[in-house]
């Protein structure tokens, strides 16, 4: 009997820029329609979500701007397009909720992460509202003050 392969666990790729540029209000888990070479590349961790976003059209969700680099050992008879649009698999209720929210001014749908869920690759997408420049500065100030507070609490325990 063949030995079972263990699938890699955890996150494949993250979009840290999206968390910086948007107030994340609601998250969804979506499946992806992938071809064989894309799954091989994702197993190797060769994916980027930096400028990716989700577009809703004709009652379907599509992932744009995600970059999956093809492996050199991948199949040669398939032309690999690293930046092709990929269909996202969501429930009808989730799609309707996303479409209603995106129709409101200021809301957008972005991809946050690609990760393994058992033997499947999932995409975490989020409904977000764009941050203004002063919002980004406020977030940075708040993060710095929390870091200083944690540092002070840690150092207070060492002095005693």
Swiss-Prot record:
| CDD domains for the chain | SmpB
Segments carrying the region annotation (Disordered) are: 136-160
Answer whether the UniProt record assigns the keyword Nuclease to this protein: no
Instruction: List the GO terms this entry assigns under cellular component, sorted alphabetically.
Output: cytosol
Question: Biological process GO annotation list?
Answer: trans-translation
Keyword Plastid attached? no
Q: For this protein, what is any one GO molecular function term?
A: RNA binding
Q: Where in the cell is it found?
A: Cytoplasm
Domain of life, source organism:
Bacteria
Keyword set for this entry? Cytoplasm, RNA-binding
Similarity comment: family membership: Belongs to the SmpB family.
Q: What does this protein do?
A: Required for rescue of stalled ribosomes mediated by trans-translation. Binds to transfer-messenger RNA (tmRNA), required for stable association of tmRNA with ribosomes. tmRNA and SmpB together mimic tRNA shape, replacing the anticodon stem-loop with SmpB. tmRNA is encoded by the ssrA gene; the 2 termini fold to resemble tRNA(Ala) and it encodes a 'tag peptide', a short internal open reading frame. During trans-translation Ala-aminoacylated tmRNA acts like a tRNA, entering the A-site of stalled ribosomes, displacing the stalled mRNA.
Q: Which HAMAP family match?
A: SmpB (MF_00023)
What name does this protein carry? SsrA-binding protein
Q: Which organism is it from?
A: Pseudomonas putida (strain GB-1)
């Amino acid at each position: 009997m063949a030995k079972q392969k263990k699938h890699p666990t955890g996150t494949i790729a993250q979009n840290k820029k999206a968390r910086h540029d948007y107030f994340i209000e609601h998250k969804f888990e979506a499946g992806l329609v992938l071809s064989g070479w894309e799954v091989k590349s994702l197993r190797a961790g060769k994916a980027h979500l930096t400028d990716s976003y989700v577009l809703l059209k004709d009652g379907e969700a599509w992932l744009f701007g995600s970059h999956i680099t093809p492996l050199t050992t991948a199949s040669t008879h398939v032309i690999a397009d690293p930046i092709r649009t990929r269909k996202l698999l969501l429930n009808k209720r989730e799609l309707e909720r996303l479409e209603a929210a995106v129709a409101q001014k200021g809301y957008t749908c972005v991809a946050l992460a690609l990760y393994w869920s058992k033997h499947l690759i999932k995409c975490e997408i989020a409904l977000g509202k764009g941050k203004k420049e002063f919002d980004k500065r406020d977030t940075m100030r708040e993060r710095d003050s929390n870091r200083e507070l944690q540092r002070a609490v840690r150092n207070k325990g060492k002095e005693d």
